[in-house]
């Protein structure tokens, strides 16, 4: 069977840049699934994406499905005919479904009986006939949150469609996709190359588009070119470009023919905190800032044009004129804000609602101030500095700079606090209170910042859970999942001596009578422990290891982490599987017993050598391991407990627990309970698989 290259290109108006990659990847994944479901043999499915097009190129696509033999077994002969030999309704219905009569059916005989059988040779459909529907289905399944409709048609897509190119080798596949008749016409760059041309063969793509249309259709190629050219441009002016992945992706999605240029701005603007300048350059203008080798911002920026100009200086000057007013605004806001102290903004916080039932930002500030001081006392941080940081924590939200450039919240608080002469750890805490903002983000760097960051997040968690508005499904408007994980990360990775129980109780207490959920403390703790499950799974821990620790509901995050590491290490020991099974057996025995057990094992009633030996070792280990548990040395404790494998195995091999002698039975059950309690001091290892 011959093979050909298949090309589909959907020519559109400018696609959403932040969604371009996901649209192209989904298109490729959907179409690959369609090919596989249809049984069409194919080679690589390569996707292309540019601002005004989505395309797929499939190598070595078979020209038709393979022929196949099908068999459909019908009713057993006994049910297929009545006593007179006439076909039953079941047999007739089955035959109709196969497109035959009962008389035309074959018989299938096996050692289990005889059935009606339909056999047929099905000729594979041509690829040409299948492709239009496969393309349409793949496009319909794209993850588009909001569809557009254009003109008088009822067609919906992410953006208006102008061309549809469907080529199998050199042949146009006739189809109407998204309201457009397929053709071999491709549109080039808006201002360079040929605005429109025809493609003779699918193999010519994407080279023909580059040569005649001045469009680089390969997304990764455009991105790599921008990155390399920007790095070279920065090197020429003695700096390093800030090529964040997200901005690099967005810019690559905005241009069809990237041309990297370098521009500058007035050095006087460098007196403004660099974060504000960078915010407007990256966020508003999609420029790449440039830093010197010492990390200081240079008065230059790199941008990407979508055209090769005969006079690039004109484009450079135009971009410099565009960015100057934005930088001047930042300078004005910075100078204006510094005319008063940061704490002078406190009264204005009373005018901004945090949440209708939970009060204003000033109310939140008062709670954060108290909670940050309490946390600082628990972790040995400077209480006065923590309460001061709590008082100032939201003041920068009322400044002109943050009002205009919202992403500078926190960092501007730090700069204004420094200007006011606040302690350095207070200023830094104002910047770091929102950390970690995302997975892998840096944690607060000093104890005061840790106290403030935890206080801010715990106040939100306690408040929102306290009024019954916990996250549901994908909806999490107050980012409670991120807040919970942030608190856990700070406590665990900074090894802070904090207990979620007392921490949550204190956060709830500070709300007074505003909260309506009587179970708020337990709800918050359960929610946070649930975040542990996701965290440790991402870290590579097995689900049963996590469940074994969660079963004990340890509320000290640092302690939880120590238990996780201990159980994970325990699983590598030779004795682990046997002891996990033994714990499960003990758990089942105790669960089925309704006996009232003793507080301690009565050694004088023990008879068998195996139970005497096990009882002695349990007593010895109980005393020996008490300091281990007190110090959180769970790994060492489980290593010691692993030595119980042989006596436990011997006990179950030789000793009957549920004997008729009640005193002996209770004594043996008590010993097993004491054995299990030792393991439960770390985790419920009976849950290990």
From Swiss-Prot:
Pfam family, one: tRNA_synt_2f
Keyword tRNA processing: no
Family annotation (InterPro entries): DALR_anticod-bd, Gly-tRNA-synth_bsu, Gly-tRNA-synth_heterodimer
SUPFAM superfamilies in alphabetical order: HD-domain/PDEase-like (SSF109604)
Listed HAMAP family: Gly_tRNA_synth_beta
Reaction(s) this enzyme catalyzes, per UniProt: tRNA(Gly) + glycine + ATP = glycyl-tRNA(Gly) + AMP + diphosphate
Annotated NCBIfam families: glyS
EC number(s) from the headed UniProt entry: 6.1.1.14
GO-annotated biological processes: arginyl-tRNA aminoacylation; glycyl-tRNA aminoacylation
Species per Swiss-Prot/TrEMBL record: Escherichia fergusonii (strain ATCC 35469 / DSM 13698 / CCUG 18766 / IAM 14443 / JCM 21226 / LMG 7866 / NBRC 102419 / NCTC 12128 / CDC 0568-73)
GO function terms (MF aspect): arginine-tRNA ligase activity; ATP binding; glycine-tRNA ligase activity
Name assigned to this protein: Glycine--tRNA ligase beta subunit
Keyword set, alphabetical order: Aminoacyl-tRNA synthetase, ATP-binding, Cytoplasm, Ligase, Nucleotide-binding, Protein biosynthesis
UniProt family annotation: Belongs to the class-II aminoacyl-tRNA synthetase family.
GO (cellular component) term, any one: cytosol
Description of how the protein assembles with itself and partners: Tetramer of two alpha and two beta subunits.
Record localization: Cytoplasm
């Amino acid at each position: 069977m011959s093979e050909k290259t298949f090309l589909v290109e959907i020519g559109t108006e400018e696609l959403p840049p932040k969604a371009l990659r996901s649209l192209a990847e989904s298109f490729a994944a959907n179409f690959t699934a369609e090919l596989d479901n249809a049984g069409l043999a194919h080679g690589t499915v390569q996707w292309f994406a540019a601002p005004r097009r989505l395309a797929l190129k499939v190598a070595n696509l078979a020209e038709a499905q393979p022929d196949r033999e099908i068999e459909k077994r019908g009713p057993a002969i006994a049910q297929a005919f009545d006593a007179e030999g006439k076909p039953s309704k079941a047999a007739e219905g089955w035959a109709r479904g196969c497109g035959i009569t009962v008389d035309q059916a074959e018989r299938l005989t096996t050692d289990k009986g005889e059935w009606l059988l339909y056999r047929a040779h099905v000729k594979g459909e041509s690829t040409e006939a299948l492709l239009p529907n496969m393309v349409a289905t793949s496009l319909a399944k794209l993850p588009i949150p909001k569809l557009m409709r254009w003109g008088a048609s009822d067609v919906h897509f992410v953006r208006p469609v102008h061309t549809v190119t469907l080529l199998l080798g050199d042949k146009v596949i006739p189809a109407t996709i998204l309201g457009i008749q397929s053709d071999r016409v491709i549109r080039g760059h808006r201002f360079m190359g040929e605005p429109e041309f025809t493609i003779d063969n699918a193999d010519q793509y994407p080279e023909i588009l580059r040569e005649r249309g001045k469009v680089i259709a390969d997304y990764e190629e455009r991105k790599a070119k921008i990155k390399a050219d920007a790095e070279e441009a920065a090197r020429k002016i003695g700096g390093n470009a800030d090529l964040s992945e997200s901005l690099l992706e967005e810019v690559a999605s905005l241009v069809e023919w990237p041309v990297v240029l370098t521009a500058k701005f007035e050095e006087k603007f460098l007196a403004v905190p660099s974060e504000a300048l960078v915010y407007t350059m990256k966020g508003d203008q999609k420029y790449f800032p440039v830093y010197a080798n010492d990390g200081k911002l240079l008065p230059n920026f790199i941008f990407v044009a979508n055209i090769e100009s005969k006079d690039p200086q004109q484009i450079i000057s135009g971009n410099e004129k565009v960015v100057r007013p934005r930088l001047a605004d930042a300078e004005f806001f910075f100078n204006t804000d510094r005319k008063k102290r940061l704490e002078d903004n406190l009264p204005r916080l009373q005018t901004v609602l945090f949440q209708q039932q939970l009060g204003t930002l000033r109310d939140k500030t008062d709670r954060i101030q108290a909670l940050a001081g309490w946390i600082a006392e628990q972790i040995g941080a400077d209480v006065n500095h923590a309460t001061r940081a709590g008082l100032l924590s939201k003041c920068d939200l009322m400044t002109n700079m943050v009002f205009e450039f919202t992403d500078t919240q926190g960092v501007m608080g730090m700069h204004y606090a420094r200007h006011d002469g606040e302690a350095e750890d207070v200023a830094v805490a104002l910047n770091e209170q929102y950390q970690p903002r995302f997975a892998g983000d840096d944690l607060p760097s000093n104890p005061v910042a840790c106290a403030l960051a935890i206080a801010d997040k715990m106040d939100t968690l306690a408040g929102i859970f306290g009024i019954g508005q916990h996250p549901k499904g994908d909806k999490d408007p107050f980012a409670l999942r991120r807040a919970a994980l942030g608190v856990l990360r700070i406590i665990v990775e900074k090894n802070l001596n904090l207990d979620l129980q007392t921490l949550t109780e204190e956060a709830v207490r500070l709300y007074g009578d505003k909260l309506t959920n009587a179970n708020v403390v337990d709800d918050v703790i359960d929610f946070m422990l649930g975040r542990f499950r996701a965290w440790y799974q991402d870290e590579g821990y097995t689900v049963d290891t996590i469940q074994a620790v969660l079963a004990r509901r340890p509320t000290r995050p640092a302690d939880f982490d120590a238990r996780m590491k201990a159980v994970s290490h325990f699983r590598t020991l030779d004795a682990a599987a046997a002891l996990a099974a033994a714990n499960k057996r003990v758990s089942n025995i105790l669960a089925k017993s309704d006996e009232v057990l003793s507080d301690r094992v009565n050694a004088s009633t023990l008879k068998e050598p195996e139970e005497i030996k096990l009882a002695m070792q349990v007593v010895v280990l109980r005393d020996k391991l008490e300091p281990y548990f007190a110090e959180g040395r769970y790994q060492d404790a489980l290593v010691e407990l692993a030595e119980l494998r042989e006596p436990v195995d011997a006990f179950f091999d030789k000793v009957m627990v549920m004997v008729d002698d009640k005193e002996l039975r209770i004594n043996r059950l008590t010993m097993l309970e004491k054995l299990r309690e030792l393991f439960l001091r770390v985790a419920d290892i009976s849950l290990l698989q």
